[in-house]
Structure formats: C-alpha cells, structure tokens
C-alpha cells in the first residue's frame, strides 16, 4: 500500500480520498476549510495537514481535485505548495479539470524538481466518485502513469493514458463538448414531448433502448421531467469547462458552433438563478421561453 496525500475535499475529492483510505493506502488530506478535513479524518483513517506542502511530505503519490487553474497553481507552487514538500521520485496526479496549458506548465515545474506529474481529469460526477467508478483520462509520462495506476484504481473504473502531458485535459474537453450537445438535445426532446402531450417517461422508456440512448438520458430524464436539479454537476462549473473548450478550440482551429451556443444557453440558466443547478437544467430555459 502507498503513502498518499489528497488535496481538495469537495464533492468529488472527499469520496475519492475515502476510497484511497478504504483500499488500505495511508492518506493525509488537505483542504482550505480545515473543518472539512477534520470531518474527513473523523470518518476515515487518515491525517490532515495545514498546508499542501505538509500534506505531501513523505507521500509517494499526491492527488488533487480543486477548482480551476489558479487553485491548482496555489496548491502546487510556492513555499506552502505540494511540490515544496514532495521528494524526488514522487508523483503528483491532478484530477481537476483545467487548461492543458497550466498542466504543461506544472508538468515542467515538477520535472525540474524530479517529480512526476500526471493530468487525470475525471468524468462520472458525484455519483461516480462516491461509488468509485470514475472514468479517468490521463496525460503524462508513461512510467509515471503506470506507477500511479494502481492507486487511481481505488476510485476509477476506466483509467487510460491518452498521451503526453495535457492529453488528459484535452480528452476531458472532448467529453464536455459531447455532454453539452447531448444535454441540449435531451432538453429539447423532453420539452417537445411535453408540448405534444406525450408522457415523457414512457417515451424515454421506449427510445432509450435505441440509437438515442445515452448516459444523460438514462440518468437524468426523470429528474428533468420532475424539475429537480439540486444534484450533479453545477452549471457554474460546466461554464468554466466550456470556456476552456472554446478557448482551446480557437487556439487549435477547431470550430465549436454548437458548444458555443450551449454555453450561452447555460449563461441564460445562470441568469435564472441556476448557477448551482445540475447541467440538465437546460430544460428550464426552454420552459421559461413558454
């Protein structure tokens, strides 16, 4: 079993760190809100530290799941950052969805200290984290990925290396581009069914077994029909991710017209007060249009 640290105990990180402990790994956690870290320790076998650097001391693997590019830099760099506490040969695995640019920046900074760096954003949402069945798309040196794989398997069902540093983040963008179009299509379909006087749940039971079936349909259609959105992946975070997709698309010359449109639709949802609603709340925008 490995000596590990986990930085960031949000809705994803909290259960992910718990799976590490349940698998028998030694876990030290760090969270900006100390009470959250203490609560985690009260539930799981582990310790908590007051800085990322202290959490990382002696760890073979340091995992993070924080908010954005700046948050990731803050837990990695500087005298209190994880890199300052890590020993040469240790490996940092980042599960945050961030830009591929900051990933490559931190990969280089880690390499200069003799530290491995793997970008491993996740998909599967809060339920996937709680059940330990996340999909993890990774980028980085093959040797570092191979070393970290058994640890990531504590909370990941599908874990794959897609290429060098940044490849994991680019793959996560592909994932979010797919989801944006799927959720908008599902929203339009369910709204259409309602306007046509059909039983939406009965309709989905029929079509979900055919070509229209998807994870979004299977896991979100009932709550969408019932107007329940206090769960899942928040619109605010989806807009952050789509912003990364759109800026990267501009950089590499990839047109994303539907993604750009759906991003604006999510902006409309935010204006309705839905920043913390699940991404499936796109249907509320259609209902608001009448």
Residue ranges and their predicted role:
Residues 12, 16, 65, 86, ...:
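Methionine-biased hydrophobic packing positions in alpha-helices, especially
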Residues 1-64, 90, 95-96:
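NAD(P)+-binding Rossmann beta1-loop-alpha1 motif at the extreme N-terminus of oxidoreductases
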Residues 147, 166-289:
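Helical "substrate-binding/catalytic lid" subdomain
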Residues 27, 48, 116-118, 159, ...:
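Hydrophobic beta-strand scaffold residues
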Residues 4, 66, 98-177:
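Rossmann-fold dinucleotide-binding core
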Residues 52-115:
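Rossmann-fold NAD(P) dinucleotide-binding segment
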């Amino acid at each position: 079993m490995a000596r590990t640290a986990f930085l960031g105990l949000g809705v994803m990180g909290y259960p992910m760190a718990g799976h590490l402990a349940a698998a028998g790994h030694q876990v030290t956690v760090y969270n900006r809100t100390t009470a959250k870290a203490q609560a985690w320790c009260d539930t799981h076998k582990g310790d908590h530290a007051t800085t990322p650097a202290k959490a990382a001391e002696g760890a073979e693997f340091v995992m993070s799941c924080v908010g954005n590019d700046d948050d990731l830099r803050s837990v990695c760099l500087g005298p209190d950052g994880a890199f300052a506490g890590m020993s040469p040969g240790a490996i940092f695995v980042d599960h945050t969805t961030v830009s591929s640019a900051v990933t490559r920046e931190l990969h280089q900074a880690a390499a200069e200290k003799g530290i491995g760096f793997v970008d491993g954003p996740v998909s599967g949402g809060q339920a996937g984290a709680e059940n330990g069945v996340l999909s993890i798309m990774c980028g980085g040196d093959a040797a570092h990925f191979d070393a970290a794989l058994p640890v990531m398997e504590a909370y990941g069902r599908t874990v794959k290396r897609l290429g060098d540093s940044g490849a994991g983040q680019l793959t996560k963008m592909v994932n979010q581009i797919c989801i944006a179009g799927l959720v908008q299509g599902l929203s339009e379909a369910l709204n259409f069914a309602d306007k046509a006087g059909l039983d939406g749940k009965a309709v989905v039971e029929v079509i979900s077994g055919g070509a229209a079936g998807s994870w979004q349909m299977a896991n979100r259609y009932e709550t969408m029909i019932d107007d329940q959105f206090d769960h899942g992946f928040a619109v605010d975070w989806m807009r952050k991710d789509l912003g990364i997709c759109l800026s990267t698309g501009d950089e590499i010359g990839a047109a994303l017209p539907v993604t750009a449109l759906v991003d604006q639709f999510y902006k409309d949802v935010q204006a309705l007060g839905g920043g913390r609603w699940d991404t499936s709340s796109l249907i509320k925008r259609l209902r608001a249009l009448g």
